[in-house]
Amino acid sequence: GCVGHRKSCEHDKKNGCCYFMTCNCWHPMGQ
């Protein structure tokens, strides 16, 4: 599921989990 906000999207972009305006990392394989 959604893990919460990130201060920087850069790391999450590399993992393909950065959303548009809010930096929410989504883990498809878990909650």
Swiss-Prot record:
Keyword check for Disulfide bond: yes
Intracellular or extracellular location(s): Secreted
One of the record's GO molecular function terms: calcium channel regulator activity
GO cellular component: extracellular region
Keywords of this entry: Calcium channel impairing toxin, Disulfide bond, Ion channel impairing toxin, Knottin, Neurotoxin, Secreted, Toxin, Voltage-gated calcium channel impairing toxin
Tissue-specificity statement: Expressed by the venom gland.
Cysteines joined through disulfide linkages: 2-18, 9-23
Keyword Hydrolase belongs to the record: no
Superkingdom of origin: Eukaryota
Family as reported in the entry's similarity comment: Belongs to the neurotoxin 02 (plectoxin) family. 09 subfamily.
Record remark on domains: The presence of a 'disulfide through disulfide knot' structurally defines this protein as a knottin.
Function: Antagonist of L-type calcium channels (Cav1/CACNA1).
Protein name: U6-ctenitoxin-Co1a
Protein's organism: Ctenus ornatus (Brazilian spider)
Lineage: Eukaryota, Metazoa, Ecdysozoa, Arthropoda, Chelicerata
